[in-house]
């Protein structure tokens, strides 16, 4: 997210605590917060999709649901053609 938008979120939060927001500012704040949260969720999802879990013996113990997502995206050498990957 653009640093200017983050600064605006913080500015509106501070103003809300000190003097309150106008109805227009409340709408702006809600839109900016939603945009920020959506970007954060995308980043976390992307990070989790890139994780491969192995046990102490080196065996892949990644949950099947995550493996399926990785197969669809071709991550970690997983392939839709090989259900054991």
Swiss-Prot record:
UniProtKB keywords: Cytoplasm
Any Pfam family matching the protein: DUF896
InterPro entries per the UniProt record, alphabetical: DUF896 (IPR009242)
Major subcellular site: cytoplasm
Cellular component aspect of the GO annotation: cytoplasm
Residue ranges, annotated region (Disordered): 62-85
Highest taxon of source: Bacteria
Gene3D superfamilies named in the record: Helix hairpin bin
Keyword Lipid biosynthesis attached: no
Location of the protein in the cell: Cytoplasm
PANTHER family with a match to the protein in the record: UPF0291 PROTEIN CBO2609/CLC_2481, UPF0291 PROTEIN YNZC
Annotated family: Belongs to the UPF0291 family.
Name of the molecule in the record: UPF0291 protein SPD_1303
Organism: Streptococcus pneumoniae serotype 2 (strain D39 / NCTC 7466)
């Amino acid at each position: 997210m653009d640093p200017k938008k983050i600064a605006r979120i913080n500015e509106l939060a501070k103003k809300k605590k000190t003097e309150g927001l106008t109805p227009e500012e409340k709408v702006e704040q809600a839109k900016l917060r939603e945009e920020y949260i959506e970007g954060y969720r995308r980043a976390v999802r992307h990070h989790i999709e890139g994780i491969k879990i192995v046990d102490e013996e080196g065996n892949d113990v990644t949950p099947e649901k995550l493996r399926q997502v990785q197969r669809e995206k071709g991550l970690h050498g997983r392939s839709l053609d090989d259900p054991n990957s």
